[in-house]
């Protein structure tokens, strides 16, 4: 009988004893909160509001702008209601501030288990029912966007001198409700934010961090308590490579051009790849940096470079008939011009399409032309700090596709940024990825590519011949200019419209001018380059 009594007593103890401990329950609750597992939190809590803890804890995170929450359990002590567990919360906020505070959980024992007795004070000690968190941010002075020599590009005075600057800088606007929501706390409707260009791309750096007050407000917006206050951090400048001397010279050349067509122009420094000027008329979409256009005969710089690797030289004898048929497609020169038997230098200078179509199919294949295009930055990803693109080149098949690509009337696509970098590479001897924002400089995935000496010895005299006796000879360009004209047909029909190109360099300046739908490069684009060069 005694043995039976002892066994029965032991079974009753096992059934009636409390499972777990307040430490275990508090640790489980905090771990689940940190992971955002609100359902698991509901299972270890009592007095849970209707709908569970997802609503109040989600509201807390949204109101304060919590990006990440780290919770550490502290001391657990018994009290008259059960036990209290202290914890340390470290909240990384969307405002880039870090909020640390000490909270506490009330634990109770019910039904032989420990539970978190939930109330708003489990989120923050002084928070009560009906209250919410409100952020008050006061933004510091915004950082400036600078050109060389400390010129403030983002100032109204600078933009008034050259409206194209705003395509690079973007604008500062008051945030809409949707924009503020997208940026997250501490942004509110009406705050100043960047829209487009550098202002948007470097919003966090330029805006700095506001002085931030986290308040607890009750009904009627009554301030019940201040939970935290953080001082402001001033906005930092963004340095660019834009040089207003060249920007204004290019702006004047474009604004006075004798054409009503859209004009896009980029000026680079060959020795560094830095963008010195970007001009567009009219404004709107950033075509000079992000547009895509057929290159026309400016692509002959790439093709001639590939031919050089196959042993051709400026003096190499070539044919320049008015037309040539390759795989059933007939290619022609502008106005069906012809030069008969001539040199490669002369065919390049007068921009003979048929010469390059024939030479490409005779000496090159798709991979060799694609490899040379890659050397000049095609398909590379530029890191200007704002959206931009370089040339696009798909490896052509043999025959008609290769022939068309060879003189820029295939699937190859470019913009003034990419073509200015091609000209810059011939001047410097190294293709360099273009740079616009220099501090903080975005990481570059594209690397400089050194050109071979034989290539340079071929291309430089050929580009000089374009100016002295070729398609640009009648423009009256100043001494020391090397260039290449381009007339790039687009659309369809017997006489399709064409874009007008002129790319080139003089000294440590490289440029590309595109007149969209402008016709002949020598007539429309080269005079703009001439006007620019004569002002610098």
Which residues does each predicted region cover?
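Short solvent-exposed beta->alpha transition segments
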Residues: 18-28, 35-86
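Beta-lactam-recognizing serine transpeptidase/beta-lactamase-like catalytic domain environment
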Residues: 225, 263-291, 306-517, 521
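Active/ligand-binding-proximal structured segments within catalytic/core domains
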Residues: 296-305, 316
């Amino acid at each position: 009988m005694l043995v039976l009594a002892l066994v029965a007593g032991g079974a009753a103890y096992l059934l009636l004893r409390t499972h777990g401990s307040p430490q275990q329950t508090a640790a489980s609750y905090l771990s689940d909160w940190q992971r955002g597992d609100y359902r698991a939190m509901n299972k270890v809590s009592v007095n849970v509001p209707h709908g569970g803890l997802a609503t109040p804890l989600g509201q807390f995170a949204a109101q304060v702008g919590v990006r990440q929450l780290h919770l550490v359990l502290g001391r657990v002590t018994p009290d008259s209601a059960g036990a209290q567990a202290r914890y340390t919360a470290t909240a990384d906020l969307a405002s880039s501030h870090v909020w640390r505070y000490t909270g506490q959980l009330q634990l109770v024992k019910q039904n032989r288990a420990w539970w978190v007795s939930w109330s708003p004070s489990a989120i923050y000690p002084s928070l009560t029912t009906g209250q919410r968190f409100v952020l008050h941010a006061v933004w510091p002075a915004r950082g400036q966007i600078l050109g060389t020599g400390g010129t403030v590009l983002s100032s109204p005075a600078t933009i008034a001198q050259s409206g194209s600057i705003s395509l690079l800088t973007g604008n500062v606007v008051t945030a809409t409700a949707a924009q503020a929501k997208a940026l997250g706390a501490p942004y509110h409707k009406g705050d100043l934010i960047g829209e487009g260009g550098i202002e948007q791309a470097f919003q966090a750096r330029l805006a700095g961090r506001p002085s931030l007050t986290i308040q607890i407000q009750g009904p009627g917006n009554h301030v019940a308590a201040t939970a935290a206050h953080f001082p402001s951090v001033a906005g930092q400048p963004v340095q660019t490579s834009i040089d207003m001397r060249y920007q204004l010279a290019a702006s004047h050349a474009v604004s006075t051009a004798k054409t009503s067509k859209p004009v896009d122009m980029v000026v680079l420094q060959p020795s560094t790849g830095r963008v010195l000027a970007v001009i567009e008329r009219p404004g709107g979409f950033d075509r000079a940096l992000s547009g895509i256009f057929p290159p026309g005969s400016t692509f002959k710089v790439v093709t001639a470079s590939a031919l050089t690797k196959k042993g051709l030289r400026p003096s190499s004898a070539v044919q320049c008939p008015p037309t040539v048929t390759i795989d059933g497609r007939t290619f022609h020169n502008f106005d069906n011009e012809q030069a008969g038997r001539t040199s490669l230098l002369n065919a390049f200078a007068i921009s003979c399409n048929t010469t390059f179509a024939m030479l490409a199919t005779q000496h090159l294949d798709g991979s060799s032309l694609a490899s040379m295009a890659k050397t000049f930055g095609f398909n590379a990803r530029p890191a200007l700090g704002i959206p931009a693109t370089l040339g696009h080149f798909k490896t052509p098949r043999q025959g008609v596709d290769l022939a068309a690509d060879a003189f820029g009337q295939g699937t190859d696509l470019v913009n003034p940024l990419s073509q200015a970098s091609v000209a810059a590479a011939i001047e410097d001897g190294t293709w360099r990825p273009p740079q616009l924002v220099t501090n903080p400089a975005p990481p570059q995935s594209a690397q400089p590519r050194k050109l071979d000496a034989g290539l340079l010895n071929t291309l430089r005299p050929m580009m000089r011949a374009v100016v002295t006796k070729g398609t640009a000879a009648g423009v009256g360009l100043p001494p020391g200019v090397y260039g290449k004209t381009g007339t790039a047909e687009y659309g369809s029909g017997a006489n399709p419209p064409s874009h007008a190109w002129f790319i080139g360099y003089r000294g440590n300046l490289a440029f590309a001018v595109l007149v969209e739908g402008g016709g002949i490069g020598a007539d429309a684009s080269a005079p703009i380059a001439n006007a620019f060069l004569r002002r610098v």
